[in-house]
């Protein structure tokens, strides 16, 4: 095996770092929160297992596509599949896919962190969280996790993580629906109006309403995700 692989201590260290890093933003408390973290953790472990441990995807594709894409080799540089497929010859860490991944991953972590601040503030006051990211969509933290995973797929796609991503998206969707049923019983009047105005997953600019003096103000009220 190439010296770039079989580095199991790096698999463990990097996996732990990213899992703890996400947890510091997400602050899991309930069983549902831990399921969300568990889904993300499984993705991260699968990612770094191929990045530094055993490059299963490279082995499978090199025999099939090796003659057409000579850069597709069992090396760390060869693991940047998008670069191999588009023929990028420069530093793989400076490719368009790699740079885009930084923005998507960073945006995902930012969304998780900012959403938690608004969620925590609302919980402290016994209110429904509908300010900040929650004014744009009902489940910003789940979307944040999906953005982080999508960013890693831009940077280092593998067969296992590509297969896992849609499955994890369904897992988060089911968690969101379960959560909404619970929230609806706690914040019945507010939730019905909030759910009517704010989309579940796709961000939408908050509606604006006219006040008594005809000035325009954001229409928001201030539950995890």
Model-derived regions: residue spans:
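Histidine-centered phosphotransfer motif of kinases
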Residues: 136-143
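Membrane-anchoring alpha-helices and their flanking helix-loop junctions
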Residues: 1-130, 148-225
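Short alpha-helical H-box segment flanking the phosphoacceptor histidine in two-component systems
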Residues: 133
């Amino acid at each position: 095996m190439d010296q770039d692989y079989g580095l199991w201590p790096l698999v463990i260290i990097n996996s732990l770092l990213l899992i703890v890093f996400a947890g510091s933003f997400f602050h899991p408390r309930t069983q549902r929160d831990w399921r969300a973290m568990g889904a993300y953790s499984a993705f991260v472990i699968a990612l770094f297992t191929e990045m530094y441990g055993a490059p299963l995807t490279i082995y499978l594709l090199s025999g099939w596509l090796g003659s057409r894409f000579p850069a597709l080799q069992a090396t760390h540089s060869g693991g940047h599949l998008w670069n191999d497929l588009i023929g990028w010859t420069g530093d793989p860490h400076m490719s368009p896919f790699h740079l885009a991944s930084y923005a998507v991953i960073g945006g995902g972590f930012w969304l998780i962190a900012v959403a938690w601040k608004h969620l925590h503030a609302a919980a402290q006051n016994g209110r429904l969280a509908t300010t900040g990211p929650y004014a744009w969509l009902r489940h910003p933290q789940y979307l944040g996790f999906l953005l982080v995973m999508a960013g890693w797929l831009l940077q280092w796609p593998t067969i296992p993580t590509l297969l896992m991503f849609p499955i994890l998206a369904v897992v988060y969707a089911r968690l969101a629906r379960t959560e909404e049923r619970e929230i609806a019983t706690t914040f019945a009047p507010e939730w019905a109006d909030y759910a009517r105005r704010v989309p579940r997953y796709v961000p939408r600019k908050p509606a604006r309403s006219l006040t008594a003096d005809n000035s325009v103000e954001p229409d928001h009220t201030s539950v995890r995700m």
